[in-house]
Amino acid sequence: MSTGTVVQVIGAVVDVEFPQDAVPQVYDALKIVGEGPCNGLVLEVQQQLGGGVVRTIAMGSSDGLRRGLEVVNSGSPITVPVGTATLGRIMNVLGEPIDEAGPIGEEERYVIHRTAPSYEDQSSSTELLETGIKVIDLVCPFAKGGKVGLFGGAGVGKTVNMMELINNIAKAHSGLSVFAGVGERTREGNDFYYEMKDSGVLDKVAMVYGQMNEPPGNRLRVALSGLTMAEKFRDEGRDVLLFVDNIYRYTLAGTEVSALLGRMPSAVGYQPTLAEEMGVLQERITSTKTGSITSVQAVYVPADDLTDPSPATTFAHLDATVVLSRQIASLGIYPAVDPLDSTSRQLDPLVVGQEHYDVANGVQTVLQRYKELKDIIAILGMDELSDEDKTTVFRARKIERFLSQPFFVAEVFTGSPGKYVSLKDTIRGFKGILNGEFDHLPEQAFYMVGSIDEVIEKANKKK
């Protein structure tokens, strides 16, 4: 183990000088040795500047760092604990416990920088994963072992949707889950912990947090730490759920680090290596012949612009995209999923079956026609429409309302008990609306309910 000294500190960027014959490799973890708050601070090598000097990023607060401090090279990249000892625990980017429940007691540690599985090891699946959320199961069904993105601007419900998915899938799913909190609010991490504890599934979840208040190094690497833990479970032959909230903050941390390292920015100020960094992470989130990783990732959309380089780069890696819309949220329809913008590779008659495909297609066709007619209605009113178009509008408004659903995780705020709707009931309900079986029911009866049976019950009560 070679030792060096700190020669320059600029915020989270620390330059360390080593003897010429013992220069650390890129991604090696270095440790500060000294008095005060910086003792034990981990630095990750990013660049070799020549002359024995390496440029590193601090994986913690750099307060109190000064020139001349001794630095020891660990000789390997950052490692995190893996295996069953991590379940039920909250850890930071370095795999250190932050839940005040004693040491992790792991039997094994893995380095966080690993190569993605080779083509021959990977396996794809067409098995559907039922979420119990009508709009998702119908329009953008998830695949077991697939990658799903929840796209949305600020305050349209990404985290609430993710919490509901965790609630519905993690509880019903007998496998294990890993939750990586990347640059999100500490309060949400806290809420998640108690949500899991109250529902009795805490012993099946490993949590890794690098929240908003932490330096960019932590936020850039915490997704890799969480993924490494998930990979270990997958390689043991288990089916793992990986939740990442939020992928955009991972990109943002990369932008901060890139600027600190003095790289020339590219489009909209993002790092020039944006596509590569995203690829390194996303290519590792995959299923192999041994086990599967099903991942759900929240993606913040800056200024509601889906063409922004960060969400646009993420799109390419996903099997299903759930787009949350501010316009739909403003109508009071939650989950605010846009059925016309959301897509899934699984929505194919060979995978979901002809009936499901036809109903989903029918719903999208009716909603698209309603969208086109809105301008005519705004100028001329409903009376100028043909009878056929009037029927389309009435059915579209019912479909729009029927796409809303009370969530289990939002019971406290809404006062309505949460509803889980099976795929069979979802298809039956929307098929009935498209066929005109419920044309006689008022559209208010379709709002915030579970299955179509509840709509009929609600309509009968109002009579």
From Swiss-Prot:
The keyword Cell membrane applies. It is a peripheral membrane protein. Keywords: ATP synthesis, ATP-binding, Cell inner membrane, Cell membrane, CF(1), Hydrogen ion transport, Ion transport, Membrane, Nucleotide-binding, Translocase, Transport. Its EC number is 7.1.2.2. GO terms for molecular function: ATP binding; ATP hydrolysis activity; proton-transporting ATP synthase activity, rotational mechanism. Signal peptide: none annotated. Its main location: membrane. It is found in: Cell inner membrane. The keyword Repeat does not apply. Belongs to the ATPase alpha/beta chains family. Produces ATP from ADP in the presence of a proton gradient across the membrane. The catalytic sites are hosted primarily by the beta subunits. This is ATP synthase subunit beta. It comes from Shewanella baltica (strain OS155 / ATCC BAA-1091).
